[in-house]
Structures are given as structure tokens and as C-alpha cells.
């Protein structure tokens, strides 16, 4: 396993988010991803900006300093729910099967 050398930092403005259900493992350049990590860089009010997992009905509320690890495959299809009142900041990356 190896860690992606780049750190991806994202800003999500109010009403933004990655609303489509997706997974981090697929074809092409993402085909070797096996584990995802996300660090929440700021607090977001309850009910906004959660990382939601389809199969589990589970939502992770963004709280500054919290790290979320999950498998990249179909078992953890997820989305980023909209934020309404604040910008949301995350750092994210992947572990690859090299």
C-alpha cells in the first residue's frame, strides 16, 4: 500500500456539496484506491455538510479535527450533503494498492 503524495484540500461554499452518491474506487486513475481518509477542518452546524453513507443510513457530522476513514469500494457509497450557513473545509486523500 502507498499513500497518495498529494493532499487535496477542498472548500465547499454554502449550498455546495458533492450531492451525487459515489464511491472512491472505480475505473481508470481511481481503480487502485482502497481506503479513503477525510479530515474535517472546521465545525459545521448540526444538520449541514455531513458525509452520508447510503448503505448504512449513517451521517458523519463535520467537527474540526475529526478524521473519517472508510473503504473506497461499493460498500461505502457516500455523498457530501449541502452546507447552508458556513463554508466547509476538508483535507482528503487515499491509500492505494501499489
Give the positions of each predicted feature:
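Histidine-centered catalytic micro-motifs
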Residues: 18-26
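A short beta-turn/loop motif at secondary-structure boundaries
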Residues: 1, 11, 83-85
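Short, conserved beta-strand element in jelly-roll/cupin
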Residues: 9-14, 27-46
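Catalytic core of Fe(II)/2-oxoglutarate
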Residues: 32-33, 46-98
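A short coil-to-beta-strand element that immediately follows conserved catalytic motifs
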Residues: 1-7, 47
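Structural recognition of the beta-strand scaffold that forms the well-ordered cores
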Residues: 8-11, 20, 68-70
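Extracellular/lumenal carbohydrate-interaction signature centered on repeated Trp-anchored short motifs
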Residues: 1, 28-30, 61
Amino acid at each position: 500500500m502507498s499513500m497518495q503524495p498529494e493532499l487535496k484540500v477542498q472548500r465547499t461554499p454554502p449550498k455546495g456539496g458533492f450531492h451525487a452518491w459515489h464511491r472512491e474506487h472505480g475505473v481508470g486513475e481511481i481503480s487502485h484506491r482502497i481506503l479513503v481518509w477525510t479530515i474535517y477542518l472546521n465545525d459545521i452546524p448540526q444538520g449541514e455538510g455531513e458525509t452520508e453513507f447510503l448503505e448504512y443510513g449513517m451521517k458523519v457530522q463535520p467537527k474540526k479535527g475529526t478524521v473519517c476513514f472508510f473503504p473506497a469500494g461499493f460498500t461505502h457509497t457516500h455523498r457530501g450533503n449541502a452546507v447552508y450557513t458556513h463554508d466547509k473545509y476538508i483535507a482528503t486523500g487515499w491509500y492505494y494498492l501499489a
